[in-house]
Amino acid sequence: YYEGEKVNITDPLDALSKGIAMVHQELQPVPARSVAENIYLGRYPTKKFGPFTVVDHEKMYEDTAALLKRVRMNFDPKQKLGELSVSQMQSVEIAKAVSANCKVLILDEPTSSLTSNEVEALFRIIEDLKKEGVSIVYISHKMDEILRISDEVTIMRDGQYIGTWDCEGLTTDFIITKMVGRELTNLY
């Protein structure tokens, strides 16, 4: 169910059309294409040119510049994606989600290859999106991050729902106990 209705999501583009976007742990960019082309891949803005429909590059670059500003990035929309850092590529993926006016953004282990400064930048983007009403599903094993940015924690174990709790007052020990299904005596 999504927004009170039963839905059948068939592929990522279908999910995106419903306002659900995902940034995967393993990014799959097209490094030889521009930032703008990666953001609009498969859904380029178009315009009429005589009897033909063509890609509206001007609109794509303008829209991309606005999106990049919204996710706190200031590089050229025409820049090749392969020239960017991993965290910048991740920001491009977030911009792609924002471009589709996503209402739900799923982030799968988003900090796994980021430096501490890049993590802070990501958290600022997440806070901005939350203020805009975007729901963030943050998948992580990093308890400090979860407790820092989450309003609620939902725990699943072996594909089964365990429970959902407000973050206020939660401890790392409580979360880990629910994740593994037993009390832990030693953490390494």
Predicted region positions:
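Glycine-rich phosphate-binding loops of nucleotide-dependent enzymes
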Residues: 1-188
